[in-house]
Amino acid sequence: MAKTSLDFKGMFCPMPIIKLSMAIRKGVSGDVFEVVCDDPGFEPDIAAWCNETGNILNGITKSGKDITATITKK
């Protein structure tokens, strides 16, 4: 199980989800991805994307404008 950190600050919908999709395809089941984004729409987008793809949204934290999501690949 690998852990990958992705910084998508400065990107807006749909780019963070597209970039995450590309990165997660290269992983294997159980890999963890920590994504930081400052797009206010990222929180509902990542929740919907995980729901649609079956990947696991482990949690979301906020610090200032930054939103950090931790996702485990299915």
Describe the role of every protein-language-model region:
Residues 26-51:
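Amphipathic, hydrophobic secondary-structure cores in small proteins
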Residues 47-74:
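C-terminal structural segments of small proteins and small subunits
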Residues 3, 32, 64-68:
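A generic structural signal for beta-strand entry/edge sites
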